[in-house]
Curated annotation (Swiss-Prot):
CDD domains: UDG-F1-like
Name of encoding gene: ung
Family classification: Belongs to the uracil-DNA glycosylase (UDG) superfamily. UNG family.
The UniProt record lists the keyword Hydrolase: yes
Name of the protein described by the UniProt record: Uracil-DNA glycosylase
Organism annotation: Staphylococcus aureus (strain MRSA252)
Taxon lineage: Bacteria, Bacillati, Bacillota, Bacilli, Bacillales
Any Pfam family hit: UDG
GO biological process assignments: base-excision repair, AP site formation via deaminated base removal
Keywords associated with the record: Cytoplasm, DNA damage, DNA repair, Hydrolase
């Protein structure tokens, strides 16, 4: 199974013309993130056959030079967003490595699908592209990973992500969940949750190689 087949199946099942027309107008008349060529970067960097872990985000960062198509990741020269900083703090506490760069392309290439449930946003307007059709698309992506793969780790931070559990066959996949790494909630159970080591422990238990969560050249 490849993304091209999954995309074909989804677009055959659902009509995304209204969303397509909306995005054409938005990209023509407003500043929208990420750049059009990066909307699907999560799928470009993580082929379907390589998926070991799925980390769900919500919508892209809405500031300049941030979003580039991977959930939680920002472009190399951008400031660290607070949630990502907390993710790295937990990573250091969990498995002892310190990451210096704010982009997560190496995770994507390791087999971590960094999937936002909404893939575009207007500059400065969080959630501005919610309910235009992206949720239907990404729900189908989650279901496809659940249906066609085995032994994938789904890391679900916060209530919106955890609402997607209903799309996942929990009998053949691993669910790791906690509150969101946002500063508003991180101290209520994200810190100390050890998602990275838990994911690797599970992957090794089913005969898969672990994720290299530490810094790598990618």
């Amino acid at each position: 199974m490849e993304w091209s087949q999954i995309f074909h199946d989804i677009t055959t099942k659902h009509d995304f013309k209204a969303m397509h027309d909306f995005l054409e107008k938005e990209y023509s008349t407003a500043i929208v993130y990420p750049d059009r060529e990066n909307i699907y970067q999560a799928f470009d960097l993580t082929p379907f056959e390589n998926i070991k872990v799925v980390i769900l985000g919500q919508d892209p960062y809405h500031g300049p030079n941030q979003a580039h198509g991977l959930a939680f990741s920002v472009q190399p020269n951008a400031k660290f967003p607070p949630s990502l900083r907390n993710m790295y703090k937990e990573l250091a506490d969990d498995i002892g490595c310190v990451r210096q760069t704010p982009h997560l392309q190496d995770w994507a290439r390791e087999g971590v699908l960094l999937l936002n449930t909404v893939l575009t946003v207007r500059q400065g307007e969080a959630n501005s592209h919610r309910d235009i059709g992206w949720e239907t698309f990404t729900d189908e992506i989650i279901k496809a990973v659940s249906d066609y793969k085995e032994h994938v780790v789904f890391i679900l931070w916060g209530k919106p992500a955890q609402q997607k559990i209903k799309l996942i066959d929990t009998s053949k996949h691993c669910i790791i969940k906690s509150v969101h790494p946002s500063p508003l909630s991180a101290y209520r159970g994200f810190f100390g949750s050890k998602p990275y080591s838990k994911a690797n422990t599970y992957l090794e238990s089913v005969g898969k190689s672990p994720i290299n969560w530490c810094e790598s050249e990618a």
